[in-house]
Amino acid sequence: MAAAAAAAAAAAAALRRLAARGGAPPPGIAPGRARAGARGLAGARQGGTADSSGTLPRFYRRAEVVAHPEGAGPDGAGAPRGTWGVALDQKLLRSPGKLPLRFPTRALAAAVAAEWQLQGEQNVRPFTMPLMQLVATAIDRVPAARGGIVTGLMDYLDTDAALCRELAGTPAAVAQEEGFAPVLAWARAELGLRPRVSDALTGTPQEAGTRDRLTEALCRLDDLELVAVDQLAGACRSLLLALAATRGAVGVQECLRLARLEEELQIEEWGMVEGGHDIDRADAAVRVAGPILLVALLRGGGAGGGTGGEGGGRGDST
C-alpha cells in the first residue's frame, strides 16, 4: 500500500493548503461534473445546494464503513462491484443520482468515510472530497458515457505531453526527454506501443496500430479506473502518463512533477506569482494524487478500517 500512502499524503497536504484559503475552491479544483455530484449528494439531505462559498451545512455526526446490504451489485459491462458502503449516522450514502454507493474494497470505503468524517464541525466542503467525487462520477455518469469518455481520452494522444517536445537542444526539451523516457519505455514494454515524438506545435498523428492498442486498453478498464484515468489525463495533459501512473509505473510525486514540468520551467525563468502559481500547484496536487490514490485503494485490497469503525448502519440513504 506504499503507493496509496504516498498519494494520500500528497492529496492531504494539497487539500490543507486549499482549505486554509477559505471560501470556494479555485477554478479547476475538480471537474464540474464531479463537484456538482458531491454538492447534490450532501444537499439532497438538506433540500438545498452549496452556498456561494462552495460549502454545505454539516447534517451528520458520524461517518463509518458498513457491509452493504445490497451485496455485490448488478452485473454489467464495467459496472463497479463491491460489498462495502458508507453510512452517515447509520443512513446509507447514495450517489447524486440516488444509486447505491458500493465500494469494491473496504480500503476505498474507509477513505471515503474519512473524507466525510474529517469535514468541519459546521460545514462540508465538497471540493475537499476528491475520492467521493470520483466514485460518484463513476457510478452516475460513466456507465452511459463510456464510449464518449474513451473517445475524449484518445483525443489527447496526438498532442500528448509525453510526445510533444520543445525544440531540440533547449533546456525544456532536455527535461522533457529525461522526464518522459520512463513513461515511453513503460508504454513500449506493457502496451506494445511505438508512439511518435515530435516538436511540431500541433503534435503529430499517431499510427492506427497505436491508437487501436490504446483504445483496447481503455475499454478494458472498469468504471472507477476509467474515471481515474480521465481526470488524471486532464490534469497531466497526457493519456500515456495517466495510464502509467495508475498502473504504478510512475509514482505520485514524479507524476505531479511531469504534469507541471513546463509551468515549473517558466516559474524558474520568470518567477512565481503569489496567489496564482502556488494555488495552481495545490490544485494540480489534488487532481493528480486523487485518481492515483483511488486506483491504489482499488488494487491494494481491503485492509484498513472505516472512520469510527465498522458499524451496522443500514438505514435509509442520505
Name each model-derived stretch.
Residues 43-144:
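An N-terminal structural lobe/cap that precedes and organizes the functional/catalytic core
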Residues 99-103, 161-164, 171, 241:
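Short cationic amphipathic helices and targeting signals
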Residues 3-10, 72-77, 302-315:
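Intrinsically disordered, low-complexity regions enriched in glycine and serine
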Residues 206-275, 286:
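An internal, amphipathic alpha-helical element
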Residues 147-214:
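Internal, conserved structured core segments that host functional sites
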Residues 1-51, 318:
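N-terminal mitochondrial targeting presequence
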Residues 256-304, 308-318:
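Long hydrophobic alpha-helical segments typical of transmembrane helices together
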